[in-house]
Structure formats: C-alpha cells, structure tokens
Amino acid sequence: RLYRDPLSDIDGQLANLDDWQRRRADHPAATNMPDIIQALRRAVRERPQTVAVLLPQSGPLAGPASAIRDGLLAAYYSALGQGHPVPVIHFLDSSQGDIVALYNQALTLGAGLVIGPLDKEQAATLAAIADLPVPTLTLNYIDGDAAAAKLFQYGLAPEDEARQVAEQAIVEGMTLAAVLYPTDSSGWGLRVANAFSQRFQELGGIVSTESSYTDNPTATTRDLLGVGQSEARARAMRRYVNQNIEFEPRRRQDIDLVFLVANPGQARQLKPALNFHYASDLPVFATSHIYAGSPAPDRDTDLNGVRFVEMPWILESGSALHQEAARAWPDGHGRFEKLFAMGVDAYRLHARLVMLASVPDSFLPGVTGQLSMNEKRVLERRLNWAWFRKGQPQRMPVVAGSTSGDAGHGRAANIVAPATR
C-alpha cells in the first residue's frame, strides 16, 4: 500500500518507499521491487516540468473546453496548495489554424507533455504522426489504431459504462438480457447497446430480445417483453374454444435483466412502461446518462430500483476539491459538470501516464472513475454503482468479502440489490 495511493504526490510516495526499504532491508520486496515501484521511480524522473494544453476558446467546443480547463486548473491549484510539485502550464487556443503548427508551438514552449486536442479530427491528425516527440494525451478518441507510440487517448466513453454493466450482470448470475435503446441521428444509443451486447455475449450471456424506441414507450416495451404475442395467443385460444376464457397476459420469461439506454426524460417514461407490462420484478440496469446529475426526487420516483454506474465526482460531493470548486464556481458547470471532472483527471494523469502504460493492473482512482490503460494506450474507466431510492441516487453497498466493481477497487462486484418497486 506504500505505492498504491495514486492521488498523493509521487515524490512523497517515492520517499516513503525509500524509507521503508531502508528500515526493512531484510524484506523480500526490498530487494525484489515490484514493477510498479520501478515505474514510480521512472515517473518521478520523467515527470513533465512544462505542460501545454490545446483547447478551443471559440466555436462549438468552447463550452465543453472551458469546463475541462476549469477542472484542470482546480486540480492544479489544489496540488499547489498541498505543497506538491506542479508543472508550468500553457493554454493554447486550438480553435484557429493548423493543429500540427500549434503542437509545434507547444514544443517551442518546452512542453514535456501535451494535453489535447479535444476535437476528434484534430486528435486523429496527431495520432497519424508516428514520431510524436513527447507524450500526448488527447481528450477524445480516434477511430482505428494510432500510429504515434507516445499518443494516449482519454475521454468519457459511454461504451466503457455499458461493458461494466454487462460484466456486473454476469457476475450476479444474470445471463439473459433485454436491451432497450433510443433511435437517434448520431447512432449513440445503438453504439452503447452494441457495447453492452458484445461484452455480455463474450462472457457467455444471451441477448434474448432488443428494441429501439423513439416516442412511444408503451408500444416499445410491450413489443420488447412479448406481451403482444401473449395477448395474440389468448385471442387465438378464445376463437378456438369459442369461449370467453379468463386470461392474464404474461411477459416473455427468457429475461433476467433489462439494459436501458436512456436519458432522464426517456427513462421516466420507460421504467413505468416496463412495470405496466409485467416487468416490475426484473432488474433494470443503465449507464450514467439516466441521471441528470442533481437530485430530483419528485421526477425520479418512477426510477426507484434502477441500478446505474456513475462517476465518483457526481456521487460524492463532500471532498475538499468539491468545496474548493464550489467556492470558485458557485453556479457549477451545468451540463458540462462531467467535463469539469475530466479536466481534474487530465491534470492528475500528467505525472502518471508512464505508470499506467508500463505496469499491468495499475490504475488511478480518479473523479471520473477508476482509470487504467489498455494495450492501445486508451484509458478505460470503471465507475461507481448507484441505485434510485425514493427518487434519489444512492451509492450501492458492496457485500463484504466480494470483489468491488466501484471506481476505487477491482473488477465486478456482488452488490446488494434493491427492491424494484
């Protein structure tokens, strides 16, 4: 645990390790240091003294970029206030001109790390440069593989959340899923649904049924659950026996859970529709998009029992950094609050990319989730679990002795499930 406190100053971590090594020279680990400790030493040596941040100051991405910049500065001043070493930071406007020229400008300023750009096309342009001279942390994802060995990708991918939901369901013994997602022009709903389905099936699950919806939740959930087929069978039986027999419709029985891809407004219609169509006993799982980000018990009562993943920054509002941010930005960042949190983690990553890239199973317990890096140098997130109770989101307790799936721990968890009504 001497080296597994990723939010502390890495110099302090290393000093604690050196002190422990001197005091416990007879310990096997003192002479056979784990890879993560060697990576920590390297991270201290290679920590960038100057960081350039490429963000747009105008255009359609200016609002999101402003929230990211505020989060990055909040983390910077928090570290400075705690006496931790901090880099010199240069903010460069990426909304004008050639991104390669701007990148070269960052290098002339002595940048040992570049954070950004946020724009997807600009990120792809840098990713295609095989010999990027310094580590570069883009704030968006590219399509396909990056040629640049020093390029790292970080974003708030909803697909990460969908895969985490799939893993949790399998751990809890749920192997038959119904998937419900919105039809939208961007294809966002389908991408999230596909990410869940692919991971669920990789782990041995079966997607029994899936439906997309637009503006008629009652008809959509009725079709998803096969209630219409049940009613049709009853009508056929009545015609066959020529009697008005008693009948209660049933939903299809090959479903263990419903994976719901929805924003708050959509979910407030769909969950009651699921209940109406005899699915009130089914666990409903969702991504963080189901929660608006601030409690609204009067509007979210219908979501009681829905389980979803959410970033720690949204669920845990009592930290010192939250208080500092509230003083600096009393009105918050509205719909960009999660991008503010992304800025916080972008700063905290600046000294730890080396460790995450070189040490398997290493992670940063960030405010956007537990961050780890895959073989393509893409940062992946694991979020905390919550459910709606009395219309308000609450952290879900973890069963003692299980492997936690929360952002501060390991993989999937056995967690206490609420009543679905």
Question: Predicted regions span which residues?
Answer:
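Solvent-exposed, acidic/polar segments of extracytosolic/periplasmic ligand-binding ectodomains
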Residues: Q269, P297-D298, T368-R421
